[in-house]
From Swiss-Prot:
This is Protein GrpE. Its main location: cytoplasm. Keywords: Chaperone, Cytoplasm, Stress response. Participates actively in the response to hyperosmotic and heat shock by preventing the aggregation of stress-denatured proteins, in association with DnaK and GrpE. It is the nucleotide exchange factor for DnaK and may function as a thermosensor. Unfolded proteins bind initially to DnaJ; upon interaction with the DnaJ-bound protein, DnaK hydrolyzes its bound ATP, resulting in the formation of a stable complex. GrpE releases ADP from DnaK; ATP binding to DnaK triggers the release of the substrate protein, thus completing the reaction cycle. It comes from the Bacteria.
Amino acid sequence: MHDPKESLETNIQETESQEKLPETPIIEEEPILTLPDDQINQLQQEVAELKDQLIWQKAENENLRKRQARELENAYKFASERLLKDLLPVIDSLNLGLQAALDTENEAVKQFITGSEMTLTMFQETLARHGIEEINPVGEKFNPELHEAVTMTPSEAHEPNTVIQVTQKGYLLNGRTVRAAQVIVSK
């Protein structure tokens, strides 16, 4: 009979001899690609141009993103401009009505004036909360960005180019002129 121990040892020895590999691996060398200098220079120039284009495109994208953010912010800030322009004649009429009624002695009219003044004050406070400012420049230097000169009149009590009377109040919305104040300016 065959001894299983001997058979196992023989198999192990055969396997070990088959597993031994040569100590130096065989490496196939690929040929090294060589290009002429002018072709290398041309490729380097193309790479540099592509890098410049990439940098320019990144800057352009960043500028576009900033511009869109600014436009969105402005759209939000000035969205109520049309509504304000429609409300300005109402405010003007309310102010004129109050001024005309101030000289009355009638007690009922005085109560109406008090209520109207309170309403106008609430209205102006609401406008102010939404970034709307009144331009009432009496005594200030004339500023063509904020004021529209209706007429000029000589005045010894005021320096030249000073607003001496407002004929119609102006309004700003978040710092931008919606309506310039109509004013009388000293000569």
